Amino acid sequence: NSSLLNRATQGAYPPGSIFKVVMSLAYLREHGTLDDFSYDCTGSITQEGHTIPCFDGEVHGQVDFTTAFAQSCNTAFVQIGLDLGADTIQKTAEDLLFNKELPISLDYRKSTIDLKKSEGIPFLMQSSIGQGTTLVSPMHMAMITSAVANNGELMKPYYIDHVENDGGDVIKTTKPSVYKELMSESEAQTLKGLMEEV
């Protein structure tokens, strides 16, 4: 019964442009910086007969990485994906717990990505902008975002702050705990800077 489905944890959706956070981390890890990136957006990009446009065919012109992220330039991120390759993107996504168990106690659907099956350049292009077969739950993307905000550390989510008895006395309190470092503090600061420009 879909009305009983907790869409925050059990829903699985193509991430779309929020996948650009994953792509940005992949690029940063591969290059060590975002400062070397420059791209001339003409409004669309075509490879092997497959064309991906920017939203409404908008032409962003010459962009650096920060501008490409802030303007959600699809063609720039398609080019980034083609340059990085499937294996690099897949590894970074798995570092962020795609295809992995999440530290949550509610029923949830695992986020999935599979770029290793050779479906060619058009598939990689779509996947680079969060389309294709990649699926993620809203909860998972919120966890990744919170790790960026928390200097790379993913806190273990909890749902109950404290429990009181019938007299109003607190009998149990949940204490925040770190689950895992998803990225370095430096990486988190760089991603945070990108997100603040949106």
Which positions does each model-derived feature cover?
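Beta-lactam-recognizing serine transpeptidase/beta-lactamase-like catalytic domain environment
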Residues: 1-17, 22-198
